[in-house]
Structures are given as C-alpha cells and as structure tokens.
Amino acid sequence: MEELQLQGYLEKDGSRQQNFLYPLIFQEYIYTLAHDHGLNSSIFYEPMEIVGLGYDNKSSSVLVKRLITQMYQQNSLIYSMNDFNQNRFVGHNNSFYSNFYSQMVSEGFAVIVEIPFSLRLVPSSEEIQIPKSQNLRSIHSIFPFLEDKLSHLNYVLDILIPYPIHLEILVQILQCWIQDVPSLHFLRFFLHEFHNWNNLNLITPTKSISVFSKENKRLFWILYNSYVSEYEFLFVFLRKQSYYLRSTSSRAFLERTHFYVKIEHLIDVCHNHFQKILWFFKDSFMHYVRYKGKAILASRGTYLLIKKWKCYLVNFWQYNFHFWSKPYRIHINPFSNYSFYFLGYISSVLINPSAVKNQMLENFYLVDTLTQKFDTIVPVIPLIGSLSKAKFCTILGHPISKPIWAELSDSDIMDRFGRICRNLSHYHSGSSKKQSLYRIKYILRLSCARTLARKHKSTVRNLLQRLGSGLLEEFFTEEEQVISPIFPKTTLFPLHGSHRERIWYLDIIRINDLANYLDWS
C-alpha cells in the first residue's frame, strides 16, 4: 500500500515531483516504508538490522503522527531535539520519544534521499534498452583483474579513505542530485541540530566510520557514499589528465551518464591547466580499486613516483574537501613482501623461483628465473573472530551453541548452519588453500550439534548416537559438490587438486556476511 502511494506521487508529474521531495517528509507512509523490514535494504549498502526501541506497531504509528505534527511546528521540533541533547544521558522521560523522533526523521529522510538515485537506475520506456551483463556486477570479477594486473606491478598504496569533513560540504555534494531546496535546508537543519551527538562522529576524521550510530546508519551511508562518489569523480578526472590514453573503469557508476557529461565539459575547460600541473605523474601502469572505506592504488613506477602520489593524495583531500588527511592513513608497500586484506581474502604477490637447465653444445648450465603470481588465501584467524562475534564460538575458536536458534525445528537449525557452510565454500572458492576452511566448517558443525543438543536437553555424544553420525555430513561438502553450477554432482571424473584450484564465480553480488565483519575493524 505504501509503495503504491509513493509511486502515485512520483507519477503525477515525474520531472516536477523529483525536484520537489520535501512534501514527502510529512507523509506517514514514508516512515512506514522506512521501518518495513521487507524494504529495509538500501541501494547503497547491504541489508542492516534496525535496532528496536521497544515499541509496538500501534504505539509507533501514534508517535509518527505526533512527529509529523511537530514538524509542522518548527519551533516545537527544535525544542524536542534540544531536550533530547540535554536529557539523553540523564534518563529523562522524554528521552525515549526524542530518540524515536530522531531515528524516524533519519530513516524517513534517507528513504526520500534515495529516490533521485533509484530513479536513475530505472530505465525510461522511451530509452533504448541496453543489455546488462550481470557477471560484471560480481564481486569476484575484480579478482581476475587483480590477478592479471598486480603481478606485474612494483608498489601499492594501501589507502584508508579519510572521512569527512564539514557537514556543510556533505549538503553541497548532494546538491547535484537533489534540486529540492527545502529538502536540503531540512537536511542541513537536521545535521546541525544533532552535530553534538555521539553518532555524528563523521565530522571527526580520526574516528572510524564504524562508530556511526545504528539508528542513523542508513542516512549516513548515503552521505558517505555521495562523498566517495564525488572524490572519485575528481580523482579519476585528474588521473585521466595525467595520461593521454583514456583509462577504463571496471566498476559500475550509479551516476554513469551524469559522470561522463560532467567530465567531457571539464576536459574542454581545464585541459591545458591540468596538463601543466600533472606532467610528472604520467604512469601508464596505474590501477585503482576500492571497496567501502579502503582503496588500493598500484603502480609499476619507482618509489619516488609512488611517494609523489602519496603527497598528492594528502593535498588532494585538503584542497578539495577542506580537511587534513593524515599521511599515516596511506601506506607505501612493495608487492614483493606485502599482503593486504581485501573483500574477505588475504591477497599477495608471490615470487616463485625456478631453475631452467640449458645445454649449449657440451656445456650445461642452470638459469634461475623469478616469476610473480597473485595469490589469495582464506584468512582463518579473522574468520574465527567473525564467528566469535556472531556467537558461534569463543574468541579462541571453541564451538558453542546458538541459543537464539534453539527454538527452531531441527531441520531449520541444520539448514541454517548448512547454508552458512555452503556460502563460505562458494565465496572462498578463489582461495589457493581451501583446506583452511575445514577448521571453520568444524566449528560450525560442532556449534550446530551443540545447538541441537541444547534444544533436546542432551549431550552432543548422545545426540549423534541417537540420530547417527552422518547427520551433519553436509558440513564437509567436497569441492566437486560445491562447484556443482559448473560440474554436475553426477560427474564421473574426480577433480584432482580441486583444493588448490581457484574458481571465481560470477554470481556473487555481495560480500559474505562473516567476511564483512572485518571491513571496518
């Protein structure tokens, strides 16, 4: 029902309504959409669980109506926010309502801000339909690129992207997407009224984005991604000016059309100016990869050149976004003895020495050669830490039961644990050492057994004796069964050495949940 109301509003006059989103703030169905668990997935980040505040649907509906009434009276809303700032740590009776109002305003406004972005993803009926390749959306598609390119490079800049900046700059970045001035004023008012909250640590560059408030995560992810999109637009533009050959991008820009319109205009205006500044940055073997708050800038150039890039990036953020990026957030490392954590893998460039026997007439001699190979392995210790955070084991890796699942049926419990194991095997199929996953599967197997034993008020030994030791055999699925999308399970030939073969799937569009625990740690 709420979706139909929103669609009807946007269909009245598409061009007019897209530029005038402010009335949606006063519509009750917007806040219903914001807290509908079925629509809680933003187009900018993976689904996140909304932290409950202890209210039921009936009482929350009344509070939403009261919030809308207060927003019509601006002074009343300001007093409510100020009252929350003063009493949130004192336990005041109004603290709950103020907390609820702040969460609802944040989530509701996030839904509204997403509308201009989501409309760009929906093709018009008049436009020519361009065939889409879903394979290019796969996370695994980046690893063959790294495997092909990084093994020939010398240095890498491991960048922890600084984040931001002054609140007003965040609003200014959104101006190119949202033409509705009242909505921008409302966002500016909301941010400045709550700038002293603990959940607004984004204005302190030394703080990690992991401290963002869970209540406001959806809104601040939009703000953060708009900032990253703006910085990458400027960075890619300057990079293209430093070399005459047109660079290509392997990632999908949400604003692809808008991006190229702006870059074509800027090239005509600023071409001569930037060529004089960036002449010493020419490097035909420069590659940039980013995921969330981390980026990799790899080069085949010398140490002096990569050091110049580091200095340039520090000044880049300072002069374009008006904040100081500390140099220690950018590390220079040679590929020969460096490994980095990226997308749930520990990646490195291995040097494999080999000797070749040569014969010339009657003389024999050996020629030593060195070859570089891009290698990816499963980070076992970090995965155990993720299992510990998810309450499957202790910090030392000792399996424990999952009490919250003990109320489910036996088939549901085994299905959940089995799905986790299959997803892990599927996602980490690109590892060159798959035997390390056996320890993870062992932890999940015993955790499942202890959860079943907890439900039946028994021990693991008695449970396995009663139900059979083959009950949990699916947790040790062989590799030839894991890669069943390519080779059917009825294959007549064994896949020898499959535990060493790396397979990159093209149907993975999001990082595994267990690997995702470590992205902002």
Curated annotation (Swiss-Prot):
Pfam families recorded: Intron_maturas2, MatK_N
Keyword Phosphoprotein: no
GO biological process: mRNA processing; RNA splicing; tRNA processing
Family: Belongs to the intron maturase 2 family. MatK subfamily.
Record HAMAP family: MatK (MF_01390)
Annotated localization: Plastid, Chloroplast
Top-level taxon of origin: Eukaryota
Keywords from the UniProt entry: Chloroplast, mRNA processing, Plastid, RNA-binding, tRNA processing
Record's protein name: Maturase K
Keyword Isomerase annotated: no
GO cellular component: chloroplast
Any one Gene Ontology molecular-function term assigned to this protein's record: RNA binding
Reported function: Usually encoded in the trnK tRNA gene intron. Probably assists in splicing its own and other chloroplast group II introns.
